């Protein structure tokens, strides 16, 4: 399908033809909307001529219009780049054209027409396309020799030229009329008087003339274009000749070089361009690796700078247009020269950068020697450009030519210019003076490119050393800070940690002699130090970490401006503390891994036991296990509870290193606290635990209970084994206290004990009490233990509802009247004053357990039946026979202890059918037969102890007091003669070891006698489980049972 010509395509594919000087349209400027060209060609079949070269928009009556392949007329870049080039079609068809009969004549054309056309096109900044390429004989190797022999004759060409001239005038007239009506087509005029005739090689079926420019897809370089233009000039017509022949078709003398084109198009460092773009996006300022056209950023300070900048940009564009694609060798050579210029400018600028106070010859020599060698690398354009950018100083407004601006970096501004027009970097120097750069108490320093507090003038030079420290540092190592022009000299000093770039810089490890630095700076205040420290987050050290550098090299002095070693940097103690925190956290993680290997469950742990793990800190536990409610820390070395989760309700910290300095203020949810066996001297640290319900502070160094007496929610308090001497509850707020354990102290007197109205358990064993009085009855008291004191008298009426009363080891002249205690169940009255007279005890009817051992003269009044008695202990009371009231008044007795008396006959025990345990240690039982008859009646007997009797005196070792005390029925649950809760060795184990050693010394006869004794007892008591301190095995009992049957 035939396509229509568009104005945009015609303006790009055709150029206006020159006209004669007498033409009517000679004064009209050329346009690009419509093009009117004249062509004189003849068809081979008919020989008639038609009007060609005049095209109008919307005309379909021109069958010979050349058809163009178009993809998008308005977007020349989107054309089919794979289509056959017009140049190839022209030369291919010209070789097949049938030439005229006459030989050609060479008539050069006038140079004025071509020159005028070229100047007209170049004035708008764009070269027009060349139309109607004339073909003339040439020595070009691309043109065949047959075409040279068959050229058009001059007479024949002259005739056709005259006809074409007439048709051109008619076409121009018609074109003007169409332009007046439709305003679409416009005649194309030129300054020359002659028109260019078409070549005989161009036929209607051919494609259009060569399109030299195709937008951004130009396949020819500027060098080829210049060569082609000069060829056209050389083949143009000479002045003064009115008849001329078709010029020879010229081609460039050199064919297109594929290698040259690739070099000119592929020498760009695309990888470096990508790095630069990404660096800009990250906020960094990398050095420019490309040496192409530089687009300078416009300043916003005034209209004059904008106009100058526009002129500079136009000049740069025009100059770069002559050589837009330099060769690879030229670019490398240009980079080398610019690198040398930058290095030279560095040393030239060093003389003017430092102030007079620091620009001595020694200072310059020192800075030159200390400059890193990598900055003087001439062959590397990247490092050279970086050095030039770091050591350049701000200059005045740029007013030189574009060539000097682009080529000379010594006079260039220190601002980083962009390689892309759409990526202009705006530096703080571009900000106008009118813009407010203050924010609160901070203001932006335009020179040093940082924020600072108001009132600090960074424009003025100042020294960071004080007068006192001036003698400690070397005069040549003085650190000055003037303005931006001195930055590059300070950066060359390897000991200076000042930032060399706005964002980051590499700090190289240098082997420099260590010198002293000032201890304090002029701005050594706590407000600036954290802000300055945050700016050093991107320091990169080689072969040495940042912490090692500051702990070792900069420990005694800091060369960093605004920072001293005591205020800004971390001290060694801080680093040690941080290290210890890390170790503690790792210990917690390791312990948690042992307890619960699956880490996601750590946050769900409610109960945690990490006893005896050698822990000394709990730092990190609250972050790892935030839901813990019950924590056991027994047997560790914890001194502080920092790191404990605030959700803890039950804390067991027994046997640690807690002291009065330990704070519990963060554990407000504590309800149950056990801090026994620690080093507390007072309880003031627990005053904030308002939710505390139970508190155990046993085995500490407490002197009083001050600090917790206002905790009205406290229910249980245990402060045994401390150093408490006086105790007063006068102003106490412990109204809800139910259990108070104060044993093993040095309490002499207790005031206002009756203020604890809800008290149910009172334990005052092993103290120095002489009296215990209550101002009012304590009706809720159930258990009272006052053993091992010096009490002479006790009014039991003050405690009417007592159920347990322990009064051992006191100095009572007379026993208390326990008949009034109707609810008394357990009564212990062991070991009273030996000077006391005969005691007569009248227990209540509901009594169950009576402990009356170790009293010289004690008598039990049993006029009534005591059906509730289950346990009776009458050891060491000098009994010669078993009392008869035991069998008659206490028929439900389960345990009877009559040890260490003078009993030889137990005949009165036959009625006790319910007895389970019988202790007769240390009596005078001799007859085996009578014993076996009585034991046979005790069907429920399980435990029997007959040691230290004449019956078995030589077959058992002697029983120690401690063994007897805990093995017999008269055992005392608590050691009376010793303070504290020190556990004794198991008496059962002691007896077994002693018995085994004694058995090894027995002769065979005594071993046989011992065996016969055991068999006889087991025959009498078949259900016996424990005999004389040893367990009876089931095999032995079965053997005895079998033998008895």
UniProtKB/Swiss-Prot annotation:
It comes from the Eukaryota. Keywords: Cytoplasm, Cytoskeleton, Leucine-rich repeat, Phosphoprotein, Repeat. One of its GO terms (molecular function) is signaling adaptor activity. It is found in: Cytoplasm; Cytoplasm, Cytoskeleton, Microtubule organizing center, Spindle pole body. Gene3D superfamilies: Ribonuclease Inhibitor. SMART domains: LRR_BAC (SM00364), LRR_SD22 (SM00365), LRR_TYP (SM00369). Pfam families: LRR_4, LRR_8. GO terms for cellular component: cytoplasm; mitotic spindle pole body; outer plaque of mitotic spindle pole body; protein-containing complex. GO terms for biological process: positive regulation of mitotic division septum assembly; regulation of mitotic cytokinesis; septation initiation signaling. Essential for the onset of septum formation. Involved in the organization of astral microtubules during mitosis. Acts as a bridge between sid4 and the other SIN proteins mediating their association with the spindle pole body (SPB). The sid4-cdc11 complex organizes a signaling hub on the SPB which coordinates cell and nuclear division. This is Septation initiation network scaffold protein cdc11. It comes from Schizosaccharomyces pombe (strain 972 / ATCC 24843) (Fission yeast). The gene is cdc11.
